[in-house]
């Protein structure tokens, strides 16, 4: 649906916020994190570069234009896991990358907002929790630029804005 052409009254977009024809309200910034299935990693290895270097690395080949998404080389260098195995799985769907990590196929670099609840419920483990990679993408609430917001849309807009801000201080 194209909010800028009035096909929807409101939407949430992730990007750099440079969309024509919409009013935008910043919701939250995004960052990348390392995750895997809890079945894959012993608890004492969650922040261990040597353990990570032995794992299959899941690549999200989905385009992330302008997001400054970290490469595996950047991540491995940051967490001190040089000489990682070249065992890599390339997937061109972010949701399939997350499903692969959930099923124990390997370790993935993913957008935190997409897996936050899975981490909180223990379905995924965030590896190296002291390391996060800020992206240049943020989440925005968008509405058509030249259309007055209907009352029910305004109520939803305000509720969502309050809910997101209270969850992301």
What positions do the PLM features span?
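Short, solvent-exposed loop/turn elements at beta->coil junctions and helix N-caps
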Residues: 1, 129-130
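Alpha-helical segments flanking ligand/cofactor-binding loops in enzyme cores
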Residues: 25, 98-99, 154
């Amino acid at each position: 649906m194209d909010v800028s052409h009035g096909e929807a009254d409101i939407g949430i977009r992730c990007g750099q916020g440079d969309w024509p024809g919409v009013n935008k309200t910043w919701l939250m910034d995004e960052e990348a994190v390392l995750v895997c299935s809890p079945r894959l990693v012993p608890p004492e290895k969650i922040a261990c570069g040597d353990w990570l270097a032995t794992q299959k690395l899941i690549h999200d080949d989905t385009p992330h234009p302008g997001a400054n998404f970290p490469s595996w080389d950047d991540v491995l260098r940051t967490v001190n896991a040089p000489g990682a195995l070249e065992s890599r799985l390339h997937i061109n769907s972010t949701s399939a990358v997350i499903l692969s990590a959930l099923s124990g196929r390997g370790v993935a670099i993913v957008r935190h907002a997409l897996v936050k609840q899975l981490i909180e419920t223990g379905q995924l483990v965030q590896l190296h929790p002291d390391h996060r990679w800020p992206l240049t993408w943020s989440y925005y609430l968008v509405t058509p630029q030249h259309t007055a917001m209907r009352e029910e849309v305004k109520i939803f807009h305000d509720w969502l804005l309050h809910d997101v801000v209270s969850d992301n201080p």
